[in-house]
From Swiss-Prot:
Catalyzes the ATP-dependent phosphorylation of the 3-deoxy-D-manno-octulosonic acid (Kdo) residue in Kdo-lipid IV(A) at the 4-OH position. It comes from Xanthomonas axonopodis pv. citri (strain 306). Its EC number is 2.7.1.166. One of its GO terms (molecular function) is kinase activity. InterPro entries: KDO_kinase, Kinase-like_dom_sf. One of its GO terms (cellular component) is plasma membrane. This is 3-deoxy-D-manno-octulosonic acid kinase.
């Protein structure tokens, strides 16, 4: 359950034959329009993000701070039908609005996530497109990068503790992989990409599903490292997770 937030503002808009709305943080943005979500409107202040993901993301140097713009794109077989359109099920169930509100709820629970700034959808017929604008985390490296460079020296224990903290708060992360776990220069961990994430009562089944997905991600990204080495690193992560979970954080 995500609570009501009085600092949210909603702005409807029309574009071509479609209509949509923008949900934004009025403490950070005085107003919002559709140009916020167009890389072309930012010109040379927007540059593509090339690490992980399916594309459709840009670093933006905005007047309100360094940001990341992400357009929601499909992967796998679904992308053959439509790369960027989703079935309309109501404004509150759009991918962008749901992720925006989930991130704000996680921040209220004092969890380390980037601050969402604005989310939009544009509905046309039975489908819609969506995008999300959020603050950019500076001077961070993903767990994937740490693993490739440092191997056994990567922050395995810190990663396990970080995940346990989010799980204790009830976050079921839909795509927990090594690209979505970041560490800043001070060694502080962050999670990103909460698309399709939900808050649940903590339970073993979905927690282990998250962890197994991360394990598969590490194996996929192992490069020249042996599976045995990756499994040993993951075992360190999992032990730290279990210890942190047992302590209640």
């Amino acid at each position: 359950m995500v609570s009501f937030d009085a600092t949210e503002a909603l702005a409807p808009y029309r574009e071509g034959r479609g209509y949509g709305a923008i949900l934004f943080d009025r403490e950070r943005l005085r107003q919002a329009d559709a140009s916020l979500f167009s890389p072309q409107s930012w010109g040379d202040r927007a540059r593509p993000v090339d690490a992980g993901g399916r594309g459709g993301a840009w670093f933006v140097d905005a007047p309100f701070g360094h940001s990341v713009l992400r357009q929601y794109l499909r992967g796998g077989m679904a992308a053959r039908v439509s790369r960027d359109r989703y079935l309309w099920k109501g404004a509150g169930r759009t991918r962008s609005f749901a992720e925006f509100r989930l991130m704000r709820e996680l921040i209220k629970r004092k969890l380390p996530v980037p601050r969402p700034l604005a989310a939009c959808y544009l509905r046309e017929g039975l489908g819609y497109r969506a995008a999300l604008l959020m603050e950019r985390l500076e001077n961070v490296r993903s767990l994937a990068e740490h693993a490739q460079v440092a191997g056994r020296g990567a922050p395995w224990e810190a990663t396990g503790q970080l995940i346990a903290r989010f799980h204790r708060a009830g976050l079921d992360h839909a795509d927990l992989n090594a690209h979505n776990i970041l560490f800043d220069a001070g060694g502080h961990g962050w999670l990103i990409d909460f698309d399709r994430g939900v808050l649940r009562i903590p339970a073993t089944r979905w927690r282990e599903r998250n962890l197994k997905r991360l394990h598969r991600s590490l194996l996929k990204l192992r490069g020249n490292r042996s599976r045995e080495d990756v499994d040993k690193d993951y075992a360190r992560l999992h032990r730290a997770y279990e210890l942190a979970w047992g302590r209640g954080y």
